[in-house]
Every structure is written in C-alpha cells, then in structure tokens.
Design a protein with these regions (language model features):
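Short alpha-helical transmembrane segments in multi-pass integral membrane proteins
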Residues: 1-20, 78-143, 187-243, 299-364, ...
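Residue-level signal for short hydrophobic patches within transmembrane helices
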Residues: 9, 13-32, 36, 59-66, ...
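Transmembrane helical elements of multi-pass membrane transporters/channels
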Residues: 18-37, 139, 150, 173, ...
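Helix-terminus/linker motif at the lipid-water interface of multi-pass membrane proteins
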Residues: 28, 32-50, 120-127, 183-190, ...
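Small-residue hotspots at the loop-to-helix junctions and early N-terminal turns
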Residues: 45-58, 133-137, 196, 268-283, ...
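Small-residue-rich hydrophobic transmembrane alpha-helices
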Residues: 50-110, 147-166, 260, 273-337, ...
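Hydrophobic transmembrane alpha-helices of multi-pass small-molecule transporters
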Residues: 62-65, 177-182, 207-211, 283-286, ...
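Short runs within selected transmembrane alpha-helices of multi-pass transporters and secretion channels
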Residues: 71, 140-158, 166-174, 195-208, ...
Length: 448
C-alpha cells in the first residue's frame, strides 16, 4: 500500500481549489453532454421532445438524488477514516459502499420504470409530450444501475482526495455520449429513445473505467469483488449520516416536481423554455456543488485528524469560492441570455420564455453558492441532520407554500419563478445563523 496523502496539511486554499477544479470540470463535462443531448433533441426531434426531456429531469433528480444523497454518508465516513489514516476502516467502508450501490442501483431501475407513467400524470404533463416523456424516462431508468455505481465509485475517490481520476472517466463518458447522440438521434433517427440509450451506454462506459481503476489500484481504497459486503457497524453509520441528505434531496426534488407541474400548466412552449433554462442552470449549480463537495471532503478529513481551526478556515475560503463563481456565472448568463437559450431551439417564443425565466434566477445565484458550500462543510463534520433541516425548511417547505399561494391567488409564470430566489435567501440566512451559533464545531473525533 502507498502512503496515504490527505488534505490535513498544506496551504488550505490550494488544497480546496486543486481538489475542486477536477470536480468542477467533471460536472461541467457532465452538464455539457446533457446540454448537447437537449440541443440535438430540440433541433432534430422537435420542441415537444425537448419539453419531454426537460420535464423528465425532475423525476430523474427525485430518484437518483436520493441514492446520490445517501452516498454522502459513505463519503463522510471514508474521508474521516482517511484523515485519521485508518486503512482498515477505509477498506471496509469502500466495500460496504459498493454493496449499497449495487443494491440501490437495481432497486432504482425497478422503481423508476414502474412509477414513470404515474409520476408524469401527477405532474400534469400535457398529452402532446406525455408519451415521449414515458419512453425517455423508462429507457433512462433501464440503465440507472450504471449511474448509481459510477457516482458511488466516484464518491469514494473524492472522499480520499483523488478527484482527478474521476474527471478523466467523466470526460470519456461525456465525449462518448455526444458521439452516441449524433449516431442514434441524427444518424439512425431513433429520436428520444436514441437520446436515452446514448446516456445509458455512456454511463456504462464510465462505470467500467472507474471500477477497473479501483480493482487495479494498490491504494487503501482498492476494490476486491469478493469482499463486497455490508459491514453492519459501518452500514448503520453510513445510513445515520447519509439518509438525512438522501431525504433532503428527495424532498427538495418533490418540491421541484411541484414547480415543474406548475410550469406544465402554462403549456408545452413554456415547458420547453424552462427545460432549456434548466440545462443552462447546470453550468452554475454543478460547479457550486463541486465546491460544496470539496468543502465536505476537506472538513471530513480534518475532523478525522482533529483539526478544528483548519475546518473553520476551510469553510470561509470555500464559501468565498462558491459565491464568487456564482456571481461571475450569473453576470455572464444574463448578458448572453438570448444567445444561450437560442442554441436549444429556433422557436422564438421558446427563446423568449427561456430568457424571461433566466432573469428571475441569475442575479441571485450568489445566495445559492453560499447556502450549498456552508451546507457542505456542515455535512463534512457529520452534522447532516442539521443541514437537512435548513434545506427542507427553505428549499422545500417554503417553496411549496409559495407555489400553493401563487397558483391560488396570483397565477403567473413570474410569481412561480420567484419561489426559487426567495427560498435561496431564506436558506442562506438560516445556514449562516446555524454556523454563527457555532455548535456544529463540537468535534466529532470519536472512533467511527
């Protein structure tokens, strides 16, 4: 085994930045191939197909979000073991994580395919896009095992600070997805089915690459197929830490489903404009989540090493990074809003709605940056329940109440869109208040 290199030493901003950059690039590549997917569908299949893909995203996030959120528990446990230089703990946590990934992936495939028509009906999906949405989602969920296994495997590498390796495999998947889209949608004329198949195959490719690396590795996180099993004491800890984040993701996704249902009530043209914006929004939120993940890993490893002061300094630095990136992204997207929405479709009305929606989001991205990065640090210390409460109150409870009031008393697209920046403001203030009180800095240095 090689010497364990951790984030518990060195210049803080460099450790966080150099860890976050591959994550940011990876997420941008992931968003790139998702965006290209939508561009190809919108231009070669039609605006209804674009609306179908867009409305499907809320359901995908609902189910995948729980699995990815629950993997936070594994990441926190592994990072704390790694920071404490506990090689045996890392080994057992890695194999428990893989067992969870395989079980969750199979379960997600079955549930996803089964609930697709029901969920789309509950969302009020218009008849003209309903059938395409069902087909796209069911084909997508047929390959969801690969997505879950890849993301959990990448989570292992991220927990030990090796974000560069997962970037390489994500780039391979992104390039594969773009070529497969061109072949299946443009060349073979498979339409929306081809787009979903391209995503499934590209996720399988990334899954094969990352598992191959873990199996061949000589590091403490080496994967051995025969050792994949759940260690009961670790399973309970992963669940205790990870389930709150999983619940957080699934409930927030439910609130987004309610927002999507409200958007659906304005018709397919508005749906297409909203779908185009959501793809663009990923270029802000995914890098912010990458910085948040860097903050989680940094906090987890330094909590494991018992370095509280370093955790606090890392929180300030990573929060500044997240807010700064969001400010720049918001300004750029506002300036070029018509051009970026116009990439997805030639329908002028769809472009008009997409630009209109962007004006409600982009000026307030900085609040979302602060909220997520502070939340990432809190989760890294093991306080996932507290972070969950803040996110549920603001991004779910408040958002649902806002939509209920809007649809009852002042039904307009602008009022619906305002639920996002107002909920970000509430969440940011609540998270700052929790951090300011300081109770999260009671070190969790007990053996895990």
């Amino acid at each position: 085994m090689k010497k364990m290199k951790t984030m518990t030493e060195g210049v803080i901003w460099k450790e966080i930045l150099f860890f976050a950059i591959p994550l940011i690039l990876g997420n941008l590549f992931q968003q790139l191939y998702n965006t290209v997917d939508s561009i190809i569908v919108g231009n070669y299949v039609g605006s209804n197909a674009l609306a179908a893909v867009g409305s499907s995203g809320a359901i995908i996030n609902l189910l995948i979000g729980f699995c990815i959120g629950a993997s936070t528990g594994a990441g926190v446990i592994i990072s704390q073991f790694y920071g404490a230089k506990n090689a045996e703990g890392v080994r057992k946590a890695v194999h428990t994580t893989m067992a969870i990934a395989l079980a969750a992936g199979v379960l997600l495939t079955v549930i996803g395919i089964a609930v697709t028509p029901v969920m789309l009906r509950l969302m009020g999906t218009p008849d003209e896009v309903f059938e395409q949405s069902v087909v796209y989602l069911q084909v997508y969920f047929a390959g969801s095992l690969f997505s879950v296994v890849y993301n959990m495997s990448a989570g292992i590498l991220n927990a030990v600070g090796n974000s560069r390796r997962s970037l390489v495999y994500l780039m391979i998947a992104a390039i594969s997805n773009i070529f497969l889209d061109l072949i299946m949608v443009v060349g073979l004329k498979l339409g929306i089915v081809g787009a979903a198949l391209a995503t499934d195959i590209s996720q399988l490719i990334s899954c094969i690459f990352i598992w191959g690396f873990l199996i061949r590795s000589e590091e403490v996180y080496k994967l051995k197929i025969r050792e994949i099993r759940c260690y009961d004491h670790l399973l309970s800890k992963i669940i205790r830490i990870g389930i709150p984040t999983g619940i957080q993701n699934i409930v927030i996704s439910l609130s987004n489903l309610i927002v999507q249902a409200s958007v659906n009530s304005f018709g397919a043209t508005v749906m297409a404009g909203f779908a185009a914006y959501i793809k663009i929004d990923g270029f802000n939120i995914l890098p912010v989540l990458s910085i948040s993940m860097a903050a989680t890993t940094f906090a987890g490893q330094n909590i494991g090493a018992g370095k509280a002061d370093r955790v606090r300094k890392g929180m300030y630095i990573s929060t500044a990074m997240g807010a700064g990136y969001s400010v720049i992204t918001g300004i750029v997207l506002l300036i070029f809003a018509p051009q970026v929405i116009g990439v997805f479709t030639t329908n002028h009305k769809v472009v008009e709605y997409g630009v209109y929606i962007m004006k409600y989001f982009c000026p307030f991205y900085w609040m979302l940056g602060i909220l997520h990065v502070l939340g990432g640090t809190i989760r890294g210390t093991g306080k996932t329940m507290q972070a969950m409460i803040v996110f549920l109150v603001s991004l779910c409870g408040f958002r649902v109440m806002w939509i209920a009031g809007t649809m009852a008393w002042a039904k307009s697209l602008g009022h619906v869109m305002m639920c996002y920046p107002t909920s970000w403001l509430l969440g940011m203030l609540l998270m700052i208040l929790y951090v300011w009180k300081g109770k999260w800095m009671i070190l969790r240095t007990e053996k895990i």
